[in-house]
Amino acid sequence: MKKSIILAIGNELVEGIIIDTNSKYISKKLLEIGYKTVAINTLPDDLEILVEEIRDSLKKADLLITTGGLGPTEDDLTREAISKTVGKELIFNEKLYNSILKKVKEFHSEIPKNIEKQAWVINGARIIENPVGTAPGQILQIGEKQIIILPGPPVEMKPIFEESLKFLEKFEKIYQKRIKTLGIPEAILVEKYKDIIYKYKDVNVATLASHISGVELRFTGKKEKVDEIVKLLKEKLSDHIYALDNETIEEVVFKKLEGKSVSFAESCTGGLISAKFVSIPGISKVFKGAIVAYSNKVKEKVLNVNKNTIQKYGAVSKECVMEMAKEVSYFLDTDYAVAVSGIAGPTGGTKEKPVGTVWICAYKRENDYYLVEKFFFRGNREIIREKSALNAFNLLRRILS
């Protein structure tokens, strides 16, 4: 696989004023045509540093891509740095200059004196005009190496980068699958299933742990090998794997319902589960509605939860969520239901039931089947609510399976 390096250039990036979103986009696109990005470096507008990094990158990679530093000001130094590094002079392109002037005149009555800087290009470079702004892109061949020079603003970078891909040699397309898991820590997941995860040395494995959405495993390599690993993990981790690739858990649940209906009884999530579900187009085919039973009185009066249940076990209990789930399924006449009750904090916790204690129940009306679990979530109020919603969908997914 060919190697690529991306250099994101600009003081505003180094100082954290602007977040670099370009590199993620570029790296993903390059992987699709057979280039593996081995480094992404953020650099200041400093000529010496730029020259050193460009020289070092060309030793390590087949393709170098730079973003930023192509403006008309004195601190825009990418052109100069590349010119100095590869030993090719900057030349003035009259045709490009006239094109830039035409664009500037459309929006400004006065022409900035320094705008001509953007018409200086590296000798021998292929010019890719900017359809949005004024700084053009450039493609340079240095022996067997290639350099793609792109502007920094994403709205300008993307169309120029897409055009530049036409001039890159296409290699074997790389195949990638992503597995999203819940309820199993990264360390345990990797240790317990390492023989499957690392079955093939030529399949690249990346793990990404999130404090809300669990652990994601990414496998990159030949299709047949990646698919085999995914198949084996799905067999072992059916309770934990909730989605693949770009799927959300809400979309997975929607597909699994297959015309069956569902309702929610929400307490600590306060309607969050419903809000996430209705973001899916066509969800009215399966979702009948929800009851936000935040107070005990609403649980008793609307959901018909037995008052003795709450007095004996509390609203945050297995017994309470089981009644909530069953009652909402009958009240709204649905095949399935999910109920959630917990303590989101920051107050309200006790020694027996600390902040973060959440009970979730998924209910199947056909055979009066309950799937109930107790969770202890860490984090602030919003994180606890998010985790509760995600795990509520996962319990529903499991009961549907």
UniProtKB/Swiss-Prot annotation:
Family matches, as InterPro entries: CinA, CinA-like_C, CinA_C, CinA_KH, Competence-induced_CinA, MoaB/Mog-like_dom_sf, MoaB/Mog_dom
Pfam families assigned to the protein according to its UniProt record, in alphabetical order: CinA, CinA_KH, MoCF_biosynth
HAMAP family, per database record: CinA_B
Protein family (similarity comment): Belongs to the CinA family.
Descriptive protein name: CinA-like protein
Biological source species: Thermosipho melanesiensis (strain DSM 12029 / CIP 104789 / BI429)
